[in-house]
Amino acid sequence: MAPTGLLVAGASFLAFRGLHWGLRRLPTPESAARDRWQWWNLCVSLAHSLLSGTGALLGLSLYPQMAADPIHGHPRWALVLVAVSVGYFLADGADLLWNQTLGKTWDLLCHHLVVVSCLSTAVLSGHYVGFSMVSLLLELNSACLHLRKLLLLSRQAPSLAFSVTSWASLATLALFRLVPLGWMSLWLFRQHHQVPLALVTLGGIGLVTVGIMSIILGIRILVNDVLQSRPHPPSPGHEKTRGTRTRRDNGPVTSNSSTLSLKD
């Protein structure tokens, strides 16, 4: 499956880059006119999260053997979904490198590097696909996070839609991010004798990295959206740090990444 998986990942890379190109040809909300690149990037990320997160949830529901045997038990199409996600993270990483400064995106790039390394193991070996499918459940929470950022970008906070999205982000963070991360950590600990040491190390680093980022992000959303009377615009001390860099096609671009921010 390795050659097919690589072809799928390559096609996915081109498809998500093409989607970004197509979104640039569509009207951008007037309120997000100053942050058009960020709007396009978030829309592409939302599309991937909905596709991969929903696919992982349906797949694990229809084929529970993927959770029972995360190493060997999986249908053929599950590996295709994992390869699609590899292509997306490579495309998003290229987009970040092209449009934002390294100082503003190093955390996201490190996150993407770890994720691509882990998912690529399943694509190249044909094993650990069930484990990868469980990890894609995190994208259900990512979909809420991307929608929340889009609402912030379009100046829809505070609003009922933003409040619902904030609560949904916290709920899915617990259910579809922290729970799967805990399950994967426990499985890796119990089955470490069946997994090569290099993969145990890689998986452990990935789980710790994403886990820390997830907890910090959850605390920030809880404080900014729930405990405070109203959400504040992004600032250096909050979830996002804004800076500008000249985009290669036209006009300035506003970056939206800060230390330990999360976008998967």
UniProtKB/Swiss-Prot annotation:
**CC per GO annotation:** plasma membrane
* Coiled-coil residue windows: none
- Composition bias (Polar residues) maps to 252-264
Compositional bias segments (type: Basic and acidic residues): 237-250
**Assigned keywords, A-Z:** Cell membrane, Membrane, Transmembrane, Transmembrane helix
Intracellular or extracellular location(s): Cell membrane
Bilayer topology reads: Multi-pass membrane protein
Q: Which residues form the TLC domain?
A: 34-227
List the residue ranges of the region (Disordered). Answer: 230-264
Q: Name one GO biological process term.
A: plasma membrane organization
Chain segments annotated as transmembrane: 3-23, 42-62, 77-97, 114-134, 169-189, 199-219
The role this protein plays is: Regulates the composition and fluidity of the plasma membrane. Inhibits the incorporation of membrane-fluidizing phospholipids containing omega-3 long-chain polyunsaturated fatty acids (LCPUFA) and thereby promotes membrane rigidity. Does not appear to have any effect on LCPUFA synthesis.
What protein family is recorded? Answer: Belongs to the TLCD family.
* Protein name as annotated: TLC domain-containing protein 2
Q: Which organism is it from?
A: Homo sapiens (Human)
> What is the phylogenetic placement of the source species in the record?
Eukaryota, Metazoa, Chordata, Craniata, Vertebrata
